[in-house]
């Protein structure tokens, strides 16, 4: 660990540029999946433990399309549409039945959904790690110390464009306004004539489509495997818990922070500590909020 610290900050400080860039590229993808989770959590009060599995499904959708000769970027709209329909089906079969129940019911339901999706993907694609070749070149800087795969740059642009489109949709469209109204007060939304069931169905389907986009980007940048979903679920929960519901700038900022934390944890302590870093961030945020809550209670008393 000390040798890695010395390498990072003394012998080759230019490697920090690599860490910062990778954190940005990773954070952009995390932000998409995390925003989808924040949307479902904030509007429907459903903690979707299958969030990461939706991401992996999107990745396997791109992988399947490449097998028939379609470039993964051109597979994006197809994967979005398929995942949107899939989200509607899951809502009708599973989520609709647990919305008004206790929080633990939704946790158990989505946990069961996660296990089911993992096994289905395992049966179809096998347990092997898969990747999608995007055929983009890799740029180098600082005499090769910093590498910038162009697919990561393109993924950053696509993630930013998609996030911008979602924000515009939520602010300008009638459905977006209905979603925001339902998130604030479902009963008042019903009084105003908003079909909250339709809003819930659309919200969950939109979340699935967002995860599908994130999954395509993940497949092009890293690797996918049927049981990797839990990794992305942990990350999205850490981001949303830290940023708060309905806070898109906070989700984006926390996604970048988590991306940087993972990169530095990996280079300093080893790759096996990257996911552990996300878990420690989650534990730290929960502990800090518990301390703040206790202080507020003491002030009230």
Locations of the language-model features?
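Membrane-interfacial amphipathic/re-entrant helices at transmembrane-helix boundaries
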Residues: 1-32, 61, 72-75, 101-106, ...
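Cytosolic-side transmembrane-helix boundaries in multi-pass membrane proteins
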Residues: 2-5, 15, 124, 184-198, ...
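Inter-helical junctions in multi-pass inner-membrane proteins, predominant
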Residues: 14-29, 169-174, 200-243, 262, ...
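Membrane-embedded helix boundary and interhelical linker motif in transport proteins
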Residues: 21, 43-89, 93
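Helix-loop-helix "hairpin" substructures at the membrane interface of multi-pass membrane proteins
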Residues: 26, 143, 147-225, 248-253
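Alpha-helical transmembrane segments within multi-pass membrane transporters and channels
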Residues: 37, 70-113, 120, 253-258
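Pore- or pathway-lining transmembrane helices of multi-pass membrane proteins that form conduits
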Residues: 53-57, 98-122, 229-241, 269-289
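Extracellular/periplasmic helix-loop junction at the C-terminal end of a transmembrane helix
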Residues: 115-144, 267-274, 294-299
């Amino acid at each position: 660990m000390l040798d890695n610290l010395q390498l990072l900050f003394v012998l080759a400080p230019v490697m920090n540029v690599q860490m910062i860039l990778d954190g940005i590229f990773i954070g952009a993808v995390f932000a998409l999946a995390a925003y989808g989770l924040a949307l479902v959590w904030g509007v429907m009060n459903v903690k979707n433990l299958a969030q990461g599995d939706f991401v992996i499904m999107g990745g396997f959708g791109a992988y399947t399309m490449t097998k028939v000769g379609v470039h993964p970027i051109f597979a994006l709209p197809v994967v979005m549409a398929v995942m949107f329909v899939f989200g509607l089906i899951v809502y009708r079969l599973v989520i609709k039945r647990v919305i008004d129940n206790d929080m633990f019911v939704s946790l158990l339901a989505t946990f069961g959904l996660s296990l089911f999706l993992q096994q289905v993907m395992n049966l179809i694609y096998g347990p092997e790690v898969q990747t999608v070749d995007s055929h983009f070149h890799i740029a180098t800087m600082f005499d090769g110390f910093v590498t910038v795969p162009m697919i990561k740059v393109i993924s950053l642009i696509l993630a930013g464009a998609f996030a911008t489109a979602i924000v515009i949709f939520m602010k300008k469209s009638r459905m977006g306004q209905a979603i925001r109204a339902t998130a604030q007060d479902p009963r008042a939304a019903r009084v105003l004539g908003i079909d909250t069931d339709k809003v819930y169905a659309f919200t969950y389907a939109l979340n699935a489509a967002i995860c599908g986009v994130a999954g395509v980007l993940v497949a092009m940048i890293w690797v996918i495997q049927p049981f990797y979903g839990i990794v992305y679920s942990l990350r999205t929960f850490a981001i949303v818990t830290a940023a708060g519901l309905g806070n898109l700038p906070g989700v984006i900022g926390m996604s970048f922070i988590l991306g940087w934390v993972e990169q530095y944890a990996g280079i300093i302590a080893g790759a096996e500590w990257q996911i552990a870093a996300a878990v420690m961030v989650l534990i730290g945020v929960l502990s800090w909020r518990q301390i703040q809550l206790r202080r507020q209670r003491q002030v009230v008393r």
